[in-house]
Every structure is written in C-alpha cells, then in structure tokens.
C-alpha cells in the first residue's frame, strides 16, 4: 500500500471494512469510486469510467457522481440489491493538516433504506435476521427502519417452512451469522432473491434493553440482538423511533405456502408481479399509506381465532351500515399523512419543515376521528382507541413555530414563524429595515446624480454595489464613489455608508439562517418526545383505515358478511371470484354455489378446458382468505369454518403461469399438502398428474385422492381430466362428483361456467382448439383420430373397495371405464371360466390348454409376479412393475 498516494491509502483502509459494498468516497463536490468498485459501478450506473494516478506504476480505474445527485445513484444500486457505504469528509479541508479525515457515516442496504423510489408508501421495508440453533429451531427477527416496527418469532420445521415465514415478511435483506449453512443461504438467495448480510454480535446493544422487556426467551433475544447490532453498525445515528419488540407465533395465523400465495395472486399477479389484478388491489380502499401497509400485513397472515375474526367483521358491518360515519372517516383519513414514517424521519434527523407541517395537519384530524369512534357501541372499537393521545400540545407547538410554506432545505432559513423567538425577530427587523434603507439609498443617489438607470445590486462575491452604465459615468460627481469593479458596459462602486449597512444586513441574514437552523433542530428534539404516542396513534388509525376499506369495497361489490362455524362445513351461495368479477367490469359473471356438509370432504371436478374449473377453485380460496382477514365475501350467503392452512397446486392452465411449472414442482407441492394438511385445512389440486404419462398421472391422482379422503379429511377441490376417476364416488363415501357444464350448439361449444352435480361426459378439448383458431385441416384430423380412439379398448382402473381380508381393508378390484387405447389384448378361453386379460400381450389361444407351455423367460417372470405383494404397493408402483415385466417379455 505504501506505493499509493496518502489519499488512496486512506481509501483502501476504509474500503477494507466494507468489502461487500460500493464505497462512495467524498472528494470535494463528488463521491468517487476506485478500483473494482469503479469498474462495476460504471457498468451498473451507466456512467463514464476514467482513471487517475494513484502513486503506483499503473493508473487506477475511477468513476464519480456529483454529491448533490448521489441520492439517485445510490437508490439505483440498492434497488439492484447492492450495498453502499457513504464516506464523508469529517473535518474542514481548510484547517486539515495532510489528508482530510474521512469516515463512513452510513451503510445503505436494501433492508435499511429510509426513503426513495425503492420504498413503496403502502409496503413495509423489512430487514430480517435469522438465527439457527443446534436443536434445529430458528428465530426470525424483523425491523422496518422506516417505521420502527420490530417483530420476532420462533420457528420449527423444514427449511421450506422457514422460507415461507421469511417470504411472508417481504424482506429484501436477511442478516445471518458468518457460520450459517451455505446450502440454506443458497435457498434464500435463489428462492426469495434476498441480499445476504452478516452479523455475529447477539447481545442487546446498550440503550435498547427497554425494547425487549416483554421478551424472555433467550433464543428470541439472540435474534433481536443480531438484528439491532446490524442496524446500529450500519446506520450510525439515533434510533429513538424503534418500537418495543412484538412477539408473534406462526400458529396464530393461517398458513399459506409461498407457491399457494403466488398461485392465488393475493398481493401480486403471477405474470406482471404487480399489485394491479391481485386481491390486494381489489381490497385496497385505504386512504393512508400506513393503512395500506397494515392491509398487506393482514393479507399475509389471515387469522385463525374465530373471536378475533368476528370482532373485525362486526366493525366492518358497523361501517357498512353507517354510510355517513364511514364517509366522514374517509374524509378525515385523506388528510392524515404517514405518521409512522414521519416519526422515523424525526428520530433519524432527516425530517424537514414540510414534514412537520404534514405531521401537524395529520394531528388536526385525530380528535374528530377518536370522538366519532368513541360514540360507537362496540367493545372492539373502545379497546382500539383506548390510550390514543391526540397530541394536542404538539399540534399547538407546530402551529406557532413552522411557516405555512417553508423551503425543503432546513439550512436556507424562512422556516420559523415571526413571534416564535425574540432574537430571531430582532435579526429579521434589522434585515428588513436594512433592505428598505438600500431601496431609499438607490432613490436618493438617482436624484443626486440625475442618472435614472443607476441601481444598487448584490452578489455573494462583492456584496452590495452601486452600478452605473459607462454612458453615464461623466455625470458622476468627482470623488463621490469608490470604484469596485469594471464590466463591459458598466462600472460598479461602493461608499463607506453602503459598506457599513452591508455589514449590518449580512450579519443579520447570516445569523437569521443559523438561528433558524438551531431553532428547528431544537424543535425536532421536542417532537422526538412524542414519537411513542405518534406510533400508537398510527396503529389505531391504520386499523380503522383497513376496516373502512373492507366496508367500502364490501358495499361497492355487494359482498356479504360470512357466518363462522365450528363445524366442518362450507355453505357458499352464489359465490364469485372477486377479482375476475371486477376485471369483467360489468359483464355478466356466473356465480356458483359451493356446498360441502360435514360428511363431504372432496369435490372431484371435471369439465371442459377453459370452462372455469380453476377459477371456481381459486374462488373458494379467496373467499376463505377474505373471511379470515375480517372482510365480507363475494356471495349472497356464506357459512364457513376457520381453516388453519391453504394448499394449492394450480398449474399452467387458464393463462396463469403458462407452462412455467414442471412435474417435479407439481409433486413437491402435492407432497407439501399431503405431509402438512389437517382436517381443518383447505386443499385445491388442479390437474394433478398431467405432467407425466397418462397411466402414471392417473395412478398418482387416484392415490392422492384416496389418501386425502382416508387419511387427512381436509376439505378438498380436485379437478381432473381423467374422467375415469369419477368412479371413485362409488367407493369413497365423502367424495362427490361435480362438473362445469357446457352445451353444443350447431357444432360449437358454449361454456356455461356453472358447477353442477355429477361427472362431465366429455372434455371438448378439440372445441377449445377451434377457439384458439388452429388450422381447419388440423381440427378435422383431430376429430378423425378421436373417433378412432373412442372406438378402441377399455381401460381397467383399480377401484378401492371395503373388504376385510387378513386384517387388510383395501384390495384392488377391476372397474371398467371407456377411454383411450391400452396395449393389452384379450385372451379368450374355451370353457366356462371367465375371460382373462393377457397383460403380456400374447396371442389368443386357439383352443383350450390344460397347462400353458411357458419358455424360460416367461417362467421367470411368472415367478416374479407370484412374489409381488399388491396390497403393499401403490397404484403407481404396481403399474411401473407391470410395465417393467412386460418390457422384459417383449425383448426377443
């Protein structure tokens, strides 16, 4: 390093502590980057890469951005998942001896951004910290630096369960210890696209102990400690707005795995990854940013406590029934700014005068809001506003201190009102009267000299001056003015009197700006005292905002209040998919019932492609989610149980994820449901098994249906194109066939989108191909092939029957169903015995044989068949074994 200049040595020393971040190194009016940082930043920011001499034999790569535009460039890098360390000059270059002292004043990361375009006003910006313990458990702590919110929970289960909870937080960055499993880190980065950071310190930092008073479990404290240490190390400033840590338990909320949340498009659409078109988009009628954030949190974690859900529903009902109350509340909420983030800016020290005006305007609405809610005859409402302080003294303080239209910068003056501070008023009097004196002097000098164009001006370099055009210089009295500056067309002069007044005026103006800054920072400290009260108010207002949002959308869309039942039954009359109905924008939407009494667990849904099977399934899931967040639901009547989990396997049909799924993903998602679902869960399986061959797929579908029916008992909607499976209704007493109806008119299919009892009789796949405008010749050929296939052999699928036999309850029994061809031939026997099927594809016996003659290979295969324990095999395993043996026989 000694070969480099002192400044580059200083840069390298600072950079050594921030290897995983871009170092914005302040040099005068620019932030410069060097070496690898410069090369990478020039590429990412599309700025010019240059070089400079740094004392070594080779020039050093360099790029830079102006300090006044740095915010935009920093946001670009953070938006891409990078970190930026901001290194400032911390001493005056004029007084510095040698290299100016520089220090990193802040590390800006995806999880610690306070403001900018990457921060959505209606979304939290959580930073997560994950701690893994030897017993296999994890503790997850989260902080939103913009609002001060802190949460922590203890997690057990698979890595997938952990990923689900991290995903639910929406965190963009996660902090782990340096020994964290690389495999698990890969899952975090690949599955959730998160920035990884490291922090090994886990003790609660000094001064923050009060935030964990209600946390007693050592594991949770360790996770919070890791989180707080990272925040302090990166931010290097006041964190007075951090709120007490809230403990939550995942078993308090409905579980919806990552894939199911995406499939259901709860908060964003699958295709665009945007809010528009999602359930959140439909339900968000909130008037405040903090209300919007709370709504999203509620949607990420629906409740499972019946009493809490009903409390919310009752409040929504109150707002639905009282139009004037609701509209008055909405008008007040429109004037409420983001109290949580304003409090955060106050604590961070980056609040400006306009922010404080927003705070005052917000507080002016609070008394009326609290008064209106206090008049409601509702225990939940009374409990909600209990302890809420309207902060009237703060409103009064801000009202008499801040100008009505202050500048953005707090260093330009014109912030503080007249009458707030006596000394400031005195300085302003001097400044104002001094300027009046200047105007009078200009008029007097014009009269004395007779020069009408004479003027008195000011600039920062020369101060005040008298300017006379060269054409009028001859009219000046000799010795009256002292020459100051010569211009192309004029001369500038000063007088002793003008210099004396200038000193008084400039001193006053300089003191005004400094005093206003000092008064503002003191005011900011006074506001800090109110931060806890402001944060409590923010929670109250946010919750009221979400509840009125539910009421507003419920009335607009004609939703109905659901009745929650402790029974395992679903009764939905005229249910609708809320988002699809909204997108149709007034066009006729066909509602459908979903009636599943306690003794009915599985709906096996068949019907044409594009007929609405997937929409019907999602409809039930969304109705369930809406009910359990406390919103009315799209139906004319709804009685629902409280579900503990929702599992979906909804594939590429109906233009949702369009071919992006694989058979392995399908099986993994099915496995997740089968392994974790309870009888209180909701399972939605759409076309399970279509990602593999017909027989494998059919076998898997049947086995999964039987397992859910016999072993789990969860309410399940299972759609399929395997019409052969509809015979399961005969053997599974809690399964019912339903189908989506369609009719043919003049050779064309018309989808009715109506769910009806019974199985569908055909798929209409070729009609869908016609709708897609495939060539007529291709359609005609498809019809020919279909006619040939429909005239061929029958498939025999295993049907489960209840037969007691050596303590076994299930044995396979053939059930004949019409379907596509199978490569088996029938062997006819010329006696009274029933005809048997030759699974080996052998020729028909021309006559009766007392004992078949088998060759060596056939004898070996027969021996293997005799050893097979069919009762110990799944349908898929049996079919695979049969296929293997058949191949063995066919080999010549």
Swiss-Prot record:
One Gene Ontology molecular-function label: mismatched DNA binding
Database matches in CDD domains: ABC_MutS1 (cd03284)
Region (Disordered): 833-854
Residues annotated as transmembrane: none
Biased composition (Basic and acidic residues): 845-854
Tree of life domain: Bacteria
PANTHER family from the UniProt entry: DNA MISMATCH REPAIR PROTEIN MSH1, MITOCHONDRIAL, DNA MISMATCH REPAIR PROTEIN MUTS FAMILY MEMBER
Protein name: DNA mismatch repair protein MutS
UniProt organism field: Bacillus cereus (strain Q1)
Name of encoding gene: mutS
Function: This protein is involved in the repair of mismatches in DNA. It is possible that it carries out the mismatch recognition step. This protein has a weak ATPase activity.
PROSITE patterns from the UniProt entry: DNA_MISMATCH_REPAIR_2
